[in-house]
């Protein structure tokens, strides 16, 4: 039962082969048995899950039918869940129970999904390895000595280990796509504004976007259908009709123009990953796609621009955690200043403190123009590069990550090396574009992903290309040993 995809579960429930409650109990027992090896969950919500599963079964018995009705999933622990701990992977929010549900959570709940728990993540979503969590590192099910990627590493590890069929994630600079690549999943970052950010604890507000993580493009289409849509409570939500993503999965790729940027194949890319990228291009050509080289001339400026903009926004967003209204509060503060200083020093981990300091520096008087303003100008240039490329092609293809998963602890003392792992993913966030990572092979037994980017609101195109690719390859069907 645990091997089934979301689409297979939907069919099984519709045909009454099993009930949502039966499936939920099977998965909860798998999580109890296997998750101690992975540490992919921060909180389990067994009672809620059983209640929701029974309610979904009752709705189905009453004649209701829907692809997500009774489907089990988990939420990354930065989506507010009413009455359930929402920690953001931080000591700062270890005792925080949200008073309301995030829009993503409430939309999926009304579609009938069953919440099994909240997944582990890098603290405040700051990281590419899921090592900065207050609750300990998450292990990659493909090799328990390796990282699963981050910051949505808990969601990635849980889905890859077949603890559940799908999960929600968020992507600020690659936090859905990079862990999806490192754990053999399909992960989609939608267009900025496609999915509501209301109730999603912010890291960098102009970059954050929620999306689905699953084993197949078909499953991502089902989950995105339940997540996407306009939300008046989110001022950056875009009032654009939501297409039927599943309906667009079977479009022929004949004549589809795929652009491969020449700047992607630089010295930092593992040559074995480059080889797998070229092989995936050949598969798509066999399906009728036309491939041409494109250029993204400002790509080399993306990392420095991102690591000014994201920390700058984070330093502002995280100023609300001051030990006064909610979250961690230090013991016996001498005065208000001491309360602020010690609560933040004790509540935030070292990586979060590092990024707050970088961000506050970039926004400080005298440096704002030199750093933050320059970074925003580079951001505009990067967006323009994509617009020029998309005038010639329909989809851009390249590696998701420069390397496969690395050993836990290998980059802890070299944050720049970890930041460089986001080289291929952050441009989509800076430009607000949709991006998808799909499984494309293995290097030394570790999964590798290929990334697809498309123009604004063309998530359906990305899902279709990935789905067609997954009809002729079997990478996405492979499971880690022991799970």
Curated annotation (Swiss-Prot):
SUPFAM superfamilies: Amidase signature (AS) enzymes (SSF75304). GO terms for biological process: translation. The keyword Ligase applies. Its EC number is 6.3.5.7. It catalyses: L-glutamyl-tRNA(Gln) + L-glutamine + ATP + H2O = L-glutaminyl-tRNA(Gln) + L-glutamate + ADP + phosphate + H(+). GO terms for cellular component: glutamyl-tRNA(Gln) amidotransferase complex. NCBIfam families: gatA (TIGR00132). Heterotrimer of A, B and C subunits. This is Glutamyl-tRNA(Gln) amidotransferase subunit A.
